[in-house]
């Protein structure tokens, strides 16, 4: 139950009764703790339509609200705010209801939808680096949130395995080892099962090949021709390319596993290749595509969005072509209600072109919503894209090692590597996901690793503190679900209990905002606020030495609720919580 929605529906009945438009009855969490828990600001915009002062409208609404079981206090403030304070029993009962529900008050979406999430997107032959974490972590959080809310999710890594960089690699290896059978057009036998290069060698070859092609137009033409021949199915090139893909996937899977990020599909641009001819024929048959200076293009029919080149002059395909073919494939195979791309905002124009063409040509069905979650860049303290101290790109494996080092330095007596791993992951993931994805942000691992402030380790420390209370009382193998039947939250005895209860029942609000806006930072902000509320409760509300048994059990119930809410929230952003720290 989203408490904001519940209160809005309660007020909407009064608005309707008084002849006011119900949509103005929206209730939101109060921006000022000193005036109430929630507020309704609808009287101000409503005044224009009702031809009455907003203060008079607000007072009229409050006079007609009859819900003493929900509201302890309803106050009107100039120019027309309605400040709402919940009844203590309603607040406690709602907290109990959430504690005893599987998803802490969150209800499944109805009807359930099928959502395809395209994220990760590493390129073949390139090791994953710090710049990849935004797509990986943001996409993983979104798939967790969508599944939690009841959607059927299909996640696809969508490898970059079919562009000009493949031709560059082929030509560079041919230059180094022309004797390899992959380059003999007359060879008809079986190709070797072992790759002629390792993934480490591939990572060294690509920069060299790229530099050569950028400095020599003839070398670039060779790479383009090799790419074209690969895409046309030249046997030796296909066999060599398959080695590139296999060893690259093995490497990036290890990187993703280290982040606890997993995919349902491991497809790439190449998997859409077999659909391109079918799709082009469809475009031609329906007069969507036309020739322009030797290339084949499709208009987007949108101002400011240029036509999309589908086939180049040389017959090769563009990234937009494979992206369209991927949409074609997904529509046929999966028939999704929504496809979400988690990709750098620098690709925004590209996706506007692809989405416009896909919708105009009916490549996707009318029910299918296309969305680009366009995230900002990861920058260092200098405001530039994050680099190592030596000025190079930091590989993901090195970043994780550094995070573990920070965790170990702060806990030198901790010998459990799994706990160090959990702290390191919380450091990286929370440090990234606390930011609104649309913004660039400064990646400061030293700051993210602090055990105080808005950090992952601070969240872990708080939950471990709450868990330790329960462990001292119930032992190591306690089960919150069964215990909650006998431990109930009661009306708050002080402001610390009240604020903790109030924070606990706002969990579904955070989840809904994260779900609807593809913004996991709402979950992070919620978890941080809950951690703060619990720590104040912990300091000011003793448990173990209480003589009042009913109060003691009520506070234990609040500890249970905190552990449950924090555990679910942390899991939604891919963070696991240790038992001890």
UniProtKB/Swiss-Prot annotation:
State the compartments where it is located. Answer: Cytoplasm
Gene behind this protein: argS
Say which enzyme class the record assigns.
Answer: ligase
Q: A GO molecular function for this record?
A: arginine-tRNA ligase activity
List, alphabetically, the InterPro entries matched.
aa-tRNA-synth_I_CS, Arg-tRNA-ligase, Arg-tRNA-synth_N, Arg-tRNA-synth_N_sf, ArgRS_core, DALR_anticod-bd, Rossmann-like_a/b/a_fold, tRNAsynth_Ia_anticodon-bd
The protein's name in its UniProt record: Arginine--tRNA ligase
A GO BP entry is: arginyl-tRNA aminoacylation
Its catalytic activity?
tRNA(Arg) + L-arginine + ATP = L-arginyl-tRNA(Arg) + AMP + diphosphate
Q: Which domain of life does the protein's organism represent?
A: Bacteria
Organism lineage reads as: Bacteria, Pseudomonadati, Pseudomonadota, Gammaproteobacteria, Thiotrichales
């Amino acid at each position: 139950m989203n408490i904001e929605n519940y209160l809005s529906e309660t007020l909407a009945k009064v608005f309707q009764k008084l002849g006011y438009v119900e949509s103005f009855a929206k209730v939101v969490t109060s921006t000022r703790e000193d005036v109430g828990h929630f507020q309704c600001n609808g009287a101000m915009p409503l005044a224009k339509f009702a031809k009455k002062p907003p203060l008079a409208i607000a007072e009229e609404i409050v006079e007609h609200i009859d819900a003493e079981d929900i509201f302890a206090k309803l106050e009107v403030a100039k120019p027309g705010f309605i400040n709402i304070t919940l009844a203590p029993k309603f607040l406690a009962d709602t907290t109990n209801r959430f504690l005893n529900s599987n998803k802490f008050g969150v209800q499944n979406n109805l009807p359930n939808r099928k959502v395809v999430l395209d994220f990760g997107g590493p390129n073949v032959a390139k090791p994953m680096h710090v710049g990849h974490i935004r797509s990986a972590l943001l996409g993983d959080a979104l798939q967790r949130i969508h599944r939690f809310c009841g959607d059927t999710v299909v996640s696809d890594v969508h490898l970059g395995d079919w562009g000009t960089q493949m031709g560059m690699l082929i030509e560079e290896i041919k230059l180094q080892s022309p004797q390899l059978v992959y380059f003999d057009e007359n060879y008809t036998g079986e190709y070797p099962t072992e790759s002629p290069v390792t993934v480490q060698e591939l990572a060294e070859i690509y920069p060299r090949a790229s530099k050569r092609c950028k400095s020599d137009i003839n070398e670039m033409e060779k790479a383009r021709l090799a790419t074209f021949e690969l895409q046309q199915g030249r046997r030796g090139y296909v066999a060599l390319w398959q080695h590139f893909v296999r060893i690259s996937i093995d490497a990036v899977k290890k990187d993703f596993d280290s982040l606890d990020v997993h995919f349902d599909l491991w497809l790439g641009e190449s998997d859409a290749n077999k659909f391109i001819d079918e799709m082009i024929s469809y475009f031609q048959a329906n007069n969507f595509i036309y020739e322009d200076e030797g290339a084949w293009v499709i208009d987007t029919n949108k101002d400011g969005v240029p036509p999309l080149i589908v086939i180049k002059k040389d017959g090769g395909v563009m990234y937009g072509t494979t992206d369209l073919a991927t949409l074609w494939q997904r529509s046929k195979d999966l028939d999704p209600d929504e496809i979400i791309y988690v990709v750098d905002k620098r690709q925004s124009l590209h996706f506007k072109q692809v989405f416009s063409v896909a919708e105009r040509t009916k490549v996707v069905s009318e029910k299918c919503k296309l969305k680009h979650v366009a995230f900002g860049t990861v920058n260092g303290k200098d405001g530039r894209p994050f680099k190592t101290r030596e000025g190079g790109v930091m590989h993901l494996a090195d970043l994780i090692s550094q995070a573990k080092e920070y965790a170990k330095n702060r806990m030198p007596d901790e010998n459990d590597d799994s706990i160090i791993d959990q702290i390191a992951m919380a450091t990286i993931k929370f440090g990234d996901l606390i930011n609104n994805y649309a913004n660039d942000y400064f990646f400061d691992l030293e700051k993210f690793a602090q055990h105080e402030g808005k950090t992952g380790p601070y969240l872990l420390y708080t939950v471990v503190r709450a868990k330790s209370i329960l462990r001292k009382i119930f032992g190591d193998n306690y089960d919150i679900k069964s215990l909650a039947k006998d431990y109930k939250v009661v009306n708050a005895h002080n402001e610390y209990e009240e604020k903790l209860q109030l924070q606990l029942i706002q969990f579904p609000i955070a989840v809904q905002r994260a779900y609807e806006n593809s913004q996991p930072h709402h979950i992070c902000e919620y978890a941080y606020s809950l951690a703060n509320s619990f720590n104040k409760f912990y300091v000011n509300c003793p448990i173990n030495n209480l003589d009042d048994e009913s109060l003691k059990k009520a506070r234990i119930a609040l500890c249970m609720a905190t552990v449950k809410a924090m555990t679910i929230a942390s899991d939604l952003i891919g963070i696991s919580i240790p038992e001890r720290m």
